[in-house]
Each structure stands twice: as structure tokens, then as C-alpha cells.
């Protein structure tokens, strides 16, 4: 989970999308997003000199948090990401996300593997369910272009379903969790937080509620899913 104060402002042609604050880096997703921002800001191509420079930057931000995770990410970045960057940028240009956010979600979901499939049946670069694919109008989940565009549209739809009163950054983390877990669980967590006289617009409080929901679950598979979603963000 990420605790916030100012570090990065991601800009988009439509204006500022979200702000990442000065943070204690305890989230792999946070590390991943910052790494991809570094890629966007400092690496214009994927030649060896540029990727070596980025690896040096990663060493500074990753530190001892997850050295194995960093090595896997660097390998995937060199071997897989170049093929899909333009798809992420194309999808980002048609929605309100920055391409690095879409790429970070895709890495967490599939490690940028277009043929990825989970035990629950989600597939593709953005790991969409059949229901979600139908909702966003894609016919082949393992088609990279369809998957990225579908995932981008789905993420934007989740973002827009949340109240405007939620602070922008909290709204972002909630949407990322909902993408992985499902909007119904986020909705239930917000309701439970309100019923406990908490702040349903605070990601930190929603996160704590989700942790309690995981402990109360009778279905071990759902306990795992909720915990994974919390860890995801």
C-alpha cells in the first residue's frame, strides 16, 4: 500500500491525470509505476545504453525491497515491453490514462504476455474476463490490440463509476484495486467503511476494510483474491 506526499506529476494532453506523492515505497505496483515513468521520461528508445541507464535508476528506487522482482521486470522490459509500447500509447490517447499506467497494470496482470491465462479464466495482456470483454466490445481477449484497448476502456469506466468527491489519488488506487478484484467488492468495502463511521473516500481506510473482509471470508479462494488485490496496489 502506498502512503502519499508529492513526488511525480503525470501530465496528459487533457491535463494533469494524477499526482503521486512522496512515498514510502512498500508497493510493488508503486515501484513498477515509478520505473515506467522513468522509462517514459528518460528513455527514448530501447537500445542497450538507455536500458542500462534505466537499470541504474531502478537500483536507486527498488533498493532492497524486491531484488528478484526488479530483475524479472528488467528482463520483461527488455524482451517484451518494446513490442507493446505503441499499443499502450494508442489506447492512452483515446482514454484519460497515461500509457505507463496501462503498462503497469498489464505487467501486474500478465507480465506483458498476450497468451497469459489464469486459473479463473481471465486472458490476454490485460487479463480480461469474458464478461468484461463483452462489456467493452472486444471479441478476442488474446488479441493484443483488443486486449489493451478493452482494458483501457474498462479501467476508465471503473474510474468514472466512483464519486467525484474522492480525492484523485485515492480514486486511482481504488480503481486499480477494482480492476483486479471487481467493482462489487470495492463498492461493498466502501459501504462497510461508511457503516463503521469511516471515510469511504480514503484508500487507506478502504484497504483496511478489504483486509477485514478477507479475514471474514468463508471461501479461501476469495480470501486469497482480496489479499492479492490489496497487495496489488
Predicted segments — roles?
Residues 20-90, 114:
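N-terminal export signals and maturation junctions of secreted/periplasmic proteins
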Residues 89, 97-113, 148-152, 175-180:
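Short, functionally critical alpha-helical segments immediately adjacent to catalytic or ligand/cofactor-binding
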Residues 110-119, 158-161, 181-196:
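Secretory-pathway/luminal and periplasmic proteins that interact with or process carbohydrate-rich
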Residues 52-63, 173-233:
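Catalytic and substrate-binding regions of cell-wall glycan-acting enzymes that process beta-1,4-linked
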Residues 71-78, 88-91, 113-116, 134-145, ...:
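Second-shell loop/turn segments in exported
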Residues 2, 6-8, 12:
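Intrinsically disordered, low-complexity segments enriched in serine/proline and basic residues
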Residues 8, 17-18:
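Aromatic (phenylalanine/tyrosine) cluster motif
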Residues 115-139, 146-157:
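Substrate-binding/active-site groove segments that recognize
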